[in-house]
């Protein structure tokens, strides 16, 4: 009951200021390391900006907790149809906070909750778009790859340099690179720590589109607006179906897709979409 009441308070505070959501309180105080606002013509896209400029948005525990809390609230906000995560022009996120991790030991790292809230991005049911400028390295690269779609600036740089400091990626880098770009390229990235240009990342299926640096966020928001204009329920089903391609065999995936396709025929939005198409009008979605 306490958790439910807390969520209500957080939702109310998050939505209090539509144009500039300086989120009031995810815990006991306003977030310090992220900025949030609702953007777009219909204010239906949430823009989260990582805000540790002096540290090139290094992903410390506090930042990741604030991000996880924000995503939890936004995922239940019916006025938000898509979420964009971005950093600065110099860095989306230059990696995890190495100083914070230096003195960690195996026992506490393995048995504790270290990195546990990093799954928040991939757990979100709504589409999440990464708008990447500058460096997206280590944990920053992994954060971008947790998102559903990546738009990148022309000078963006991706990579997993953990090998250079005596460790390996720990938030999905080895797995997501291999699934997206294949074993050979993933091995090169993870075993050398080499940076990957935006164009190389696009060629290997990591990045969807590339834009001039000053257009990346705007284009990501436009994409978010287009997605937010669709049925939220059907968007969620489509996202789930695509993600299953990484977990299931082809036959299992085809079966899963078919079942979800059949399930759309139990929704009001499928009926409305097809009726609106036949009547040559814009559908009015209910997310039911």
Swiss-Prot record:
Localisation: Mitochondrion matrix
One cellular component term from this protein's GO annotations in UniProt: mitochondrial matrix
Residues at which substrate binds: 96-99, 139
Keyword hit for Lipid metabolism: yes
Site (Important for catalytic activity): 162
Reaction(s) catalysed by this chain's protein: a (3S)-3-hydroxyacyl-CoA = a (2E)-enoyl-CoA + H2O; a 4-saturated-(3S)-3-hydroxyacyl-CoA = a (3E)-enoyl-CoA + H2O
Keywords from the named record: Fatty acid metabolism, Lipid metabolism, Lyase, Mitochondrion
A Pfam family assignment: ECH_1
Primary residence: mitochondrion
Superkingdom of origin: Eukaryota
Assigned protein family: Belongs to the enoyl-CoA hydratase/isomerase family.
Descriptive protein name: Probable enoyl-CoA hydratase, mitochondrial
Organism: Caenorhabditis elegans
Gene: ech-6
């Amino acid at each position: 009951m306490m958790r439910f009441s807390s969520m209500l308070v957080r939702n109310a505070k998050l939505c209090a200021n539509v144009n500039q959501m300086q989120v009031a309180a995810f815990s006991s105080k306003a977030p310090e390391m992220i900025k949030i606002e609702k953007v777009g013509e219909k204010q239906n896209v949430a823009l989260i900006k990582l805000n540790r400029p002096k540290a090139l948005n290094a992903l410390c525990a506090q930042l990741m907790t604030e991000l996880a809390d924000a995503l939890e609230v936004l995922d239940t906000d019916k006025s938000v149809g898509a979420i964009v995560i971005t950093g600065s022009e110099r860095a989306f996120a230059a990696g995890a906070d190495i100083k914070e991790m230096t003195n960690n030991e195996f026992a506490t790292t393995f048995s504790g909750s270290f990195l546990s809230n990093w799954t928040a991005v991939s757990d979100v049911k709504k589409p999440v778009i990464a708008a990447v400028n500058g460096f997206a390295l280590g944990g920053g690269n992994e954060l971008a790859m947790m998102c559903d779609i990546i738009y990148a600036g022309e000078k963006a740089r991706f990579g997993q340099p953990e090998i250079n400091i005596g460790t390996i990626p720990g938030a999905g880098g080895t797995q997501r690179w291999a699934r997206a770009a294949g074993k050979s390229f993933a091995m090169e990235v993870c075993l050398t720590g080499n940076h990957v240009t935006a164009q190389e990342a696009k060629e290997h299926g990591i990045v969807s589109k590339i834009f001039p640096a000053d257009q990346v966020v705007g284009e990501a928001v436009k994409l978010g607006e287009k997605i937010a204009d669709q049925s939220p329920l059907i968007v969620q089903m489509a996202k789930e179906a695509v993600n299953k391609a990484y977990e299931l065999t082809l036959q299992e995936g085809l079966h899963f897709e078919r079942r979800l396709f059949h399930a759309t025929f139990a929704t009001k939005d499928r009926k409305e979409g097809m009726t609106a198409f036949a009547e040559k009008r814009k559908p009015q979605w209910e997310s039911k």
